[in-house]
């Protein structure tokens, strides 16, 4: 692991948190996505998909097992640097993008400083 990655923890498969700089980072290309005190999705590329493209009708007619775009939308969230798909959301039309990950950065930094937690191989662990 490079020295610049030492202060990062892996949050999801494709998303890292740089604790010292308080930035969201793409795990694949290292691109800064945005401030860690905000929703990381604000710095990503969003693709609002028609659910019928993803789940094509299985049978003809009104009841065809395909999601109705009047009831659901599919939003794909991509890294603006490398295009890796970070997340997918199924939302009601008009519903804002969810803010699903939020850390208490001040508390986390304090606990790291005190030695209660350590970062090993991009994982946050309790100190021994």
Give names to the regions the model predicted.
Residues 34, 82-87:
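Short loop/beta submotifs within extracellular cysteine-rich repeat domains
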Residues 72-76, 83-85:
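Extracellular structured ligand-interaction cores
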């Amino acid at each position: 692991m490079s020295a610049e990655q030492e202060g990062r923890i892996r949050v999801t498969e494709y998303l890292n948190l740089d604790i010292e700089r308080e930035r969201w980072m793409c795990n694949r290309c290292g691109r800064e996505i945005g401030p860690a005190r905000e929703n990381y999705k604000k710095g990503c590329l969003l693709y609002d998909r028609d659910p019928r493209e993803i789940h094509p009708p299985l049978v003809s007619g009104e009841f065809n097992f395909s999601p109705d775009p009047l009831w659901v939308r599919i939003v794909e969230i991509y890294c603006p640097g490398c295009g890796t798909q970070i997340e997918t959301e199924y939302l009601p039309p008009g519903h804002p993008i969810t803010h699903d990950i939020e850390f208490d950065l001040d508390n986390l930094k304090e606990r790291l400083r005190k030695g209660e937690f350590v970062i090993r191989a991009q994982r946050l662990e309790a100190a021994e």
